[in-house]
Amino acid sequence: MKLNFKVELLGRPTFQPIIEVQRSSSSISKFLSSLVPNLAPDSATILVAGVGSGNTTWTLHTVIDLCLQDSSISVCFVSSRCAINSQMKHKIARQLKCEHDLDCYNEIGLQQLKQIGPVTILTYHALYSMIREGDSRLQDVDFFIFDEVHSLVQDATFVSFTGELLRDLPRFFSSAKRIYLSATPEPILAHLAKVESQPIHVLRFPSHYPQWKPIFYADESILLQHLHSIPKTEKALIFVPSISAGRSLSSKFDSAQLITARTKLENPQKWQELLSTQELSARYTFSTSTIDAGVSLTDPALRHIVCSSIDPVEVIQQAGRRRLKSGETLSVYIPLPSQQQLWLQLSRLEETLSILRTTSNNQSLFISKYVLEEDRTDIRQLCYWKDGKILPNYLAIASLDRQAQNIRHLINAKSPYILERTIYHALGLSLPADNRFIYLKHRSDGEISAFQDWLHAQVGEISEKDSFSETFKTQYQNCFGARKNDRSDRSWGLSVIKKVLSTLNWGFSIEAKRGIWVLSDLRTHSEGGEKIG
């Protein structure tokens, strides 16, 4: 056990010590069954475990077990997303043996349902409204559970009240046993220590993601070309920074859908189907942050997730939507910005931070120049109204500061591969030998045309098998880069070439006929053979 004091945050109250314990136990459920009943009122505990570990499910399950033993116990469960709550409502009802009571609700009604037995289920948006309206019904609950608590910082750049809500939590739930859950608590931990009335106990389980394969790309066009070439039997989930970006990108693909916050209102049946089946209905799904937390996807065809950020916290949360079974793997795509792009991002962040810091110096100038300007919605959504003043959300400033610090770290790094190493470290992965990270290679139209022309030339020709195999492999890698299991000292056999041709979907196939490889152009129905050497 170690006492870990975090950096002071200017202008905030004295922070509580953070007492951190590393847990090596592999059984979260067994540990929670001994921990939760012994928590004291007005205590603060953060449980940290990797995405997909069952941290949320087992915490809630353990607390509800206590409710079943003692009918006087009450619980408030709060999360960052409606999706989390929708999935948890079914689990809560199942454990309380009242799941049939949910049958009378349609999709919208289920979203609006806030009480199941002794458990109140809210998003943090709904909780904030209750606190602001002076609703005191929840102040005497025995357990307060906040899932994905880091979202108060991560969402702060588009939800203006997260800082105010964080300040209110320990006061509003002052008699409760407060349990915070997160796989990525780093953004929120110091801020939570500022507002909590008691020392914070951080119980951290090891988290690593050996089934994830990070793939880096330097240009969006490279990514789009690659996604178009994935096997037809596989699906991709692509996170986008905005609805407009999602619309633009999804228009470039067949069998594509866009999921946004509006989906659950405009198409609640589709939304509920996504949550209940845990599968994607389109080959390519583009999504805003609506499903970047809480949505669990078990779709075996989902093999590719594209992250919209280089922040390790967001990479983990977005890639973590796919729940993997033993033996399954996931390709996780991460942008690799250039120095010029990093400088541009940093410049924008510093400009926004400079504007927000003018609020304390000159309110009237800040309001007239930024808040009332029609094209400055970016500034307005960072601010809230209190006591006759328009104030910036201090967690938004913290979030922007954190982004700026991360970018400065990349810009000023003396050693190469700094972003790649940072991501590998965050995912608990061993660094590849000789820094052999995986990158998407830009394939030019010329290289693709050369490959296609070469294939056309082989139809009707007879050549030595090993020569054909080696040339085919080289041509493919010139266009698309090496595949995961490719080795320089191994040629491709017939089965590999057949699979690659099927994936490319260029109208070629290859078969073995009487010891001869026969390459066919399916569009012209002509054949050629390569004899075995």
Regions found by a protein language model. Give the residues of each.
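N-terminal helicase ATP-binding lobe
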Residues: 1-181, 185-286, 290-317, 322-337, ...
